[in-house]
């Protein structure tokens, strides 16, 4: 089974949508662009967001098992994926790639 690296490549905040629809919250996502995590054995890396893991885990598991080429050639690197978390107010984009 391969290790899989998860890199935070973009973090966005839709303040206009938050102002209209979201109740105020004290703690928001603390991931930062450039943060890297390594999944070993297709398991959630320590310190990685639980909600984001729910979004990326199927891709991580597939890459860890040697798969890839998602959606018939979607990515330039067939052993990678670009996946975002499902927070509509503060989406975070992750580049996921198998590593040797």
Which sequence ranges carry the predicted segments?
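Short, structured beta-strand/loop micro-motifs enriched in basic residues and often containing a Trp
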Residues: 2, 13-23
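Ser/Thr- (and often Asn-) enriched beta-sheet segments in non-cytosolic proteins
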Residues: 3-7, 36-38, 93-98
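Beta-strand elements of well-folded, non-transmembrane domains
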Residues: 10-12, 100
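Short loop/turn segments at secondary-structure transitions that flank enzyme active sites
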Residues: 12-14, 43-45
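Short, flexible N-terminal segments of the mature chain
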Residues: 19-44
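Short, Lys/Arg- and Gly-enriched loop/turn segments at beta-strand edges
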Residues: 44-55
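Short, compact, well-ordered microdomains
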Residues: 58-100
């Amino acid at each position: 089974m391969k290790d899989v690296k998860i890199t935070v490549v973009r973090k966005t905040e839709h303040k206009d949508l938050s102002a209209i629809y979201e109740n105020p919250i004290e703690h928001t996502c603390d991931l930062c662009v450039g943060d890297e995590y390594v999944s070993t054995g297709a398991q959630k890396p320590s310190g990685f967001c639980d909600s984001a893991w729910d979004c990326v885990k199927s891709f991580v598991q597939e890459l860890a098992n040697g798969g890839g080429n998602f959606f018939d050639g979607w990515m330039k690197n067939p052993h990678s994926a670009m996946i975002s978390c499902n927070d509509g107010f503060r989406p975070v984009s992750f580049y996921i790639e198998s590593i040797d």
